[in-house]
UniProtKB/Swiss-Prot annotation:
The lineage of its organism: Eukaryota, Metazoa, Chordata, Craniata, Vertebrata. NCBIfam families: 6PF1K_euk (TIGR02478). It is found in: Cytoplasm. ATP binds at residues 25, 88-89, 118-121. One of its GO terms (biological process) is glycogen catabolic process. This is ATP-dependent 6-phosphofructokinase, muscle type. GO terms for molecular function: 6-phosphofructokinase activity; AMP binding; ATP binding; carbohydrate binding; fructose binding; fructose-6-phosphate binding; identical protein binding; kinase binding. It catalyses: beta-D-fructose 6-phosphate + ATP = beta-D-fructose 1,6-bisphosphate + ADP + H(+). Residues 402-780 are annotated as: C-terminal regulatory PFK domain 2. Its main location: cytoplasm. The active site is at residue 166. It comes from Rattus norvegicus. Allosterically activated by ADP, AMP, or fructose 2,6-bisphosphate, and allosterically inhibited by ATP or citrate. Pfam families: PFK.
Length: 780
C-alpha cells in the first residue's frame, strides 16, 4: 500500500457526518464503542454527532443531537451503561416520528447512522433506512427541506453494533455487554458459594436473558452448577425426579452445597414457565434441604465493563466507521459482529431472520434446531455442560486406559478449570485418570496419584495451580520420566501450561527416538498470562491477567485525574510478548504501549513525551503509558520514567508502577473458566480417539507427528496442530510465535490516543453471509 493510500484514511470522511446512538437496554461496553466511533470518525475527517436518549433523541432533535469532540469521550471507557443515554421510543415506530427524525438528520447533513442496541433497535432502524427516500420526498413537498438538501442526503447508510447482555442475536459469537454481565453473575455466585457451604444450603439463582439461555448456560459451566434451566432446551417430563436425584447424589459424595441456575425465560416441554420459586418448593418438599432463591436482576447490567467488552466495543466501533465510509446506496444495512477473534460484517436482515427463526423454532417446540440456530458457541457450551452435569459419575475405579494430566510453567488462572474438565470427562469415558504434581519434575520423581470425581470438586473458580507447577523441562529427566510412564502405565498425557509446556512437548517428541515409552499421545493446552504459545490465538489465564491490569489502570487514571498533570508509567508482564501491554492499552485507554514486537527508538519516546505535553494543554490533564517488561533491555521502566520526568518538568510529573505477580493471581474470569473447561473437554475427547488409534498388540505405540499436538484457538475454531509443525512458526530465543494476530490492533490503540498515523484501510472485514457462515461451522 502506498503512502498516498495510507494518507487517504485521514481524508475519507471529509464533508460527511455521522450520528451515533445507543438504544434499548443498556449494556456495559457501549461507552467504549461510542468512544471508538467518535475518535475514529474525527480521525478520518468526519463530523460526529451524539444522539442522546436513543431514537427518542433522533425524533425530538434540538439539544438531543450534539456534535462530539475528541475530549467529550474522555474517561468514558471504564464506565458502565451508556453516557449518551438510551430510551425505548414509541414515536419512532410511527411514520410521523420517523419523518421528524429524517428532518433532524437532513438539517445537520447527517447521512450515516451508527446504532448500538439490541435486536428491536436494529429492525426499527432498517425500516427507517428503507423509507428514507419517501420520507425525504414528503419533507421536500412540505417545504421543510430544500432540493439541494434532498440531493445531498439522497441515501442513508446504517451500521449496527449489537449491544445486549443477553447474547441473543444470531450472527455474532458475543454481543457487547455479555462478558461483563457474566463477570457480575460469577462474582455473585462465588460470593454465594461460601455462605452456601457454611450452612449446607441449596441456592437457586435466577439470571437475565429474556428468551435466551446463554448467560445461564455459561454461568453454570463457569461455576460448576448442579443443574441449569434454559428456554432452548426444556428438561424432560420427569425432570423433578432427575433434579432431586442429582442433588442428593452430589450431597452423598460429600458436597456441602448445591447451585441451580435458572434463566428468566425457562420453560418445560409444554411451554409452561419454570420459576425459581417452583424449584425451591420442589427441593424443600422432596429433599428437605435448606433452599434459598436469589434473583440477580439489574445488577447484571451494571458495573465496570470487562476488558473483553472494552476491546470488543473499540474494535467494533472502528469497523463500524469503516463500513459507513465505504457504504454506497446499494450496500445493504450491515451488522458488525464477532466470529472467533475476527470482526465480520453480516447483512442485517439475514441476522434478524435467523434470530426470528430461533423464536419460531422454540414456539413450535423444535428445541434441537433452536440450539443449532443459536450458533457454534452456544452448541459447544451445551454439549460440554451435558457431559459434565448430566452424566452419572462412574462408581468403579480403574478403566479402559490411563491418562495423566499435569501443569507446566508459571501459574495461570483457569488451569484448575482445565484440570477439572480433563479429569471428569476422562472418568466419564471410562478411563483411569492420574494427576501429576509439580510438572515434569513431578513426573520424573513419581509425584503421581489417581484422581476420582470428587478430587476436582469446586476447582473451576479457583485461581493459580492446585496441582503445583514448575518450569523444569523434561530433557534432563527423560529416563526417569520413561520409567514412571511404564510404572504407572500412562497411555496419554495432557499438559496444561505456557511456553515451557510447548517446549516440553517438543522435547518429548525428540526423546521418542531414544525411549519407546515416550511414544504415547500427548496434547498441550496453552495456559499462560503471556499468551505466547505458538498455535493458539488465546491462552487460558490471559483474560484474567488483562482484567487485573485494567482494574489497576482504572484506579491509577482516577488518581491521575484528581492530581492533574500527571503521567503514569506501568510495567506489565508477558516476557517478550506484548499481548498484555497492547490489549490492556486498548482496554484502559493508554497513550502508548511499548512492546518488543514493535521496536522503538529514543525518537519515538521523544514523540510520546511531546504528545503528552500537547495533551496537558487540553481538558484531559493526565497520561497513561504501558511498558511490556522485556520490550527493550536498555529503555527500562526506570529509564522511561526518568526521561519523562526530565522532559516533562514544569508541564507534568511522572510516576511509575510495576504490577508484578498480581497479574498471575486472582480467581479466573468467566471467559477463562469457560475456555479452560471447553479446552479440557476437547483435549480429552481427542486423547481417547488417539489412544484407540495407537493401540496395537496390547500396548500403545504412537510415533506419528500428529500424536503430539497443541490444542489452540485459531480465528474461528479449536484446532489440533502437531508440535513439530509449529517449530518453524516459533522464535525460540524470545519465546514468542513469529506471527501474532493482535499486532493488527496496534494502530487502533494509537488512533484512539490521538496519534497522527498512517492507517492501512485495506485490512477490514468484508460482507459475509450468515447462512454460508453457519454451514462452514458445522464441522467445528
Amino acid at each position: 500500500m502506498t503512502h498516498e493510500e495510507h494518507h487517504e484514511a485521514k481524508t475519507l470522511g471529509i464533508g460527511k457526518a455521522i450520528a451515533v446512538l445507543t438504544s434499548g437496554g443498556d449494556a456495559q461496553g457501549m461507552n467504549a464503542t461510542v468512544r471508538a466511533v467518535v475518535r475514529v470518525g474525527i480521525f478520518t475527517g468526519l463530523r460526529v454527532f451524539f444522539v442522546h436518549e436513543g431514537y427518542q433523541g433522533l425524533v425530538d432533535g434540538g439539544e438531543h443531537i450534539r456534535e462530539a469532540t475528541w475530549e467529550s469521550v474522555s474517561m468514558m471507557l471504564q464506565l458502565g451503561g451508556t453516557v449518551i443515554g438510551s430510551a425505548r421510543c414509541k414515536d419512532f415506530r410511527e411514520r410521523e416520528g420517523r419523518l421528524r427524525a429524517a428532518h433532524n438528520l437532513v438539517k445537520r447533513g447527517i447521512t450515516n447512522l451508527c446504532v448500538i442496541g439490541g435486536d428491536g433497535s436494529l429492525t426499527g432502524a432498517d425500516t427507517f433506512r428503507s423509507e428514507w427516500s419517501d420520507l425525504l420526498n414528503d419533507l421536500q413537498k412540505d417545504g421543510k427541506i430544500t432540493a439541494e438538501e434532498r440531493t445531498k442526503s439522497s441515501y442513508l447508510n446504517i451500521v449496527f453494533l449489537v449491544g445486549s447482555i443477553d447474547n441473543d442475536f444470531c450472527g455474532t459469537d458475543m454481543t457487547i455487554g455479555t462478558d461483563s454481565a457474566l463477570h457480575r453473575i460469577v462474582e455473585i455466585v462465588d460470593a454465594i458459594t461460601t455462605t452456601a457451604q457454611s450452612h449446607q444450603r441449596t441456592f437457586v439463582l435466577e439470571v437475565m436473558g429474556r428468551h435466551c439461555g446463554y448467560l445461564a448456560l455459561v454461568t453454570s459451566l463457569s461455576c460448576g452448577a448442579d443443574w441449569v434451566f434454559i428456554p432452548e432446551c426444556p428438561p424432560d417430563d420427569d425432570w423433578e425426579e432427575h433434579l432431586c436425584r442429582r442433588l442428593s447424589e452430589t450431597r452423598t459424595r460429600g458436597s456441602r452445597l448445591n447451585i441451580i441456575i435458572v434463566a428468566e425465560g425457562a420453560i418445560d416441554k409444554n411451554g409452561k414457565p419454570i420459576t425459581s420459586e417452583d424449584i425451591k418448593n420442589l427441593v424443600v418438599k422432596r429433599l428437605g434441604y435448606d433452599t434459598r432463591v436469589t434473583v440477580l436482576g439489574h445488577v447484571q447490567r451494571g458495573g465496570t465493563p470487562s476488558a473483553f467488552d472494552r476491546i470488543l466495543g473499540s474494535r467494533m466501533g472502528v469497523e463500524a466507521v469503516m463500513a459507513l465510509l465505504e457504504g454506497t446506496p446499494d450496500t445493504p444495512a450491515c451488522v458488525v459482529s464477532l466470529s472467533g477473534n475476527t470482526a465480520v460484517r453480516l447483512p442485517l436482515m439475514e441476522c434478524v431472520q435467523v434470530t426470528k427463526d430461533v423464536t419460531k423454532a422454540m414456539d413450535e417446540k423444535r428445541f434441537d434446531e433452536a440450539i443449532k440456530l443459536r450458533g457454534r458457541s452456544f452448541m459447544n457450551n451445551w454439549e460440554v455442560y451435558k457431559l459434565l452435569a448430566h452424566v452419572r459419575p462412574p462408581v468403579s475405579k480403574g478403566g479402559l486406559h490411563t491418562v495423566a494430566v499435569m501443569n507446566v510453567g508459571a501459574p495461570a488462572a483457569g488451569m484448575n478449570a482445565a484440570v477439572r474438565s480433563t479429569v471428569r470427562i476422562g472418568l466419564i469415558q471410562g478411563n483411569r485418570v492420574l494427576v501429576v504434581h509439580d510438572g515434569f519434575e513431578g513426573l520424573a520423581k513419581g509425584q503421581i496419584e489417581e484422581a476420582g470425581w470428587s478430587y476436582v470438586g469446586g476447582w473451576t473458580g479457583q485461581g493459580g495451580s492446585k496441582l503445583g507447577t514448575k518450569r523444569t523441562l523434561p530433557k534432563k529427566n527423560l529416563e526417569q520420566i520413561s520409567a514412571n510412564i511404564t510404572k504407572y502405565n500412562i497411555q496419554g498425557l495432557v499438559i496444561i501450561g505456557g511456553f515451557e509446556a510447548y517446549t516440553g512437548g517438543l522435547e518429548l517428541m525428540e526423546g521418542r527416538k531414544q525411549f519407546d515409552e515416550l511414544c504415547i499421545p500427548f496434547v498441550v493446552i496453552p495456559a499462560t498470562v503471556s499468551n505466547n504459545v505458538p498455535g493458539s490465538d488465546f491462552s487460558i489465564g490471559a483474560d484474567t491477567a488483562l482484567n487485573t491490569i485494567c482494574t489497576t489502570c482504572d484506579r491509577i487514571k482516577q488518581s491521575a485525574a484528581g492530581t492533574k498533570r500527571r503521567v503514569f508509567i506501568i510495567e506489565t508482564m508477558g516476557g517478550y510478548c506484548g499481548y498484555l501491554a497492547t490489549m490492556a492499552g486498548l482496554a484502559a485507554g493508554a497513550d502508548a504501549a511499548y512492546i518488543f514486537e514493535e521496536p522503538f527508538t529514543i525518537r519515538d519516546l521523544q514523540v510520546n513525551v511531546e504528545h503528552l505535553v500537547q495533551k496537558m494543554k487540553t481538558t484531559v490533564k493526565r497520561g497513561l503509558v504501558l511498558r511490556n517488561e522485556k520490550c527493550n533491555e536498555n529503555y527500562t521502566t526506570d529509564f522511561i520514567f526518568n526521561l519523562y520526568s526530565e522532559e516533562g518538568k514544569g508541564i507534568f510529573d511522572s510516576r511509575k508502577n510495576v504490577l508484578g505477580h498480581m497479574q498471575q493471581g486472582g480467581n479466573p474470569t468467566p471467559f477463562d473458566r469457560n475456555f479452560a473447561t471447553k479446552m479440557g473437554a476437547k483435549a480429552t475427547n481427542w486423547m481417547s480417539g488417539k489412544i484407540k488409534e495407537s493401540y496395537r498388540n496390547g500396548r500403545i505405540f504412537a510415533n506419528t507427528p500428529d500424536s503430539g499436538c497443541v490444542l489452540g484457538m485459531r480465528k474461528r475454531a479449536l484446532v489440533f496442530q502437531p508440535v513439530t509443525e509449529l517449530k518453524d512458526q516459533t522464535d525460540f530465543e524470545h519465546r514468542i510465535p513469529k506471527e501474532q494476530w493482535w499486532l493488527k490492533l496496534r494502530p487502533i490503540l494509537k488512533i484512539l490516543a490521538k496519534y497522527e498515523i498512517d492507517l492501512d484501510t485495506s485490512d477490514h472485514a468484508h460482507l459475509e453471509h450468515i447462512s454460508r457462515k453457519r454451514s462452514g461451522e458445522a464441522a467445528v
